[in-house]
């Protein structure tokens, strides 16, 4: 039908993207929910970053955010890939790569502990 999409919108069957995103942001900003969620993510990442340095790992970049960039050997990377999800960021040399771990509001302490025990 011609103008079918417009008819759906006019009758409330399809929300505008701006309305939906605005509703999400209203919820995030209420009672500083976004800050609480971000604080948890950054705290978890800092735990990983601090432990990695204490264990002797070099960092590709020091990050104050919810991302951690340790440099690992290719063997370590292969071993970690069986139990953890992360991104290969950049090759450092023939035997080592920088990887990126990202934490979120939903990253549990148990997941961080498991990673730290494996590193």
Where are these regions (language model features)?
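Active-site C-terminal subdomain of aminotransferase-like
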Residues: 1-67
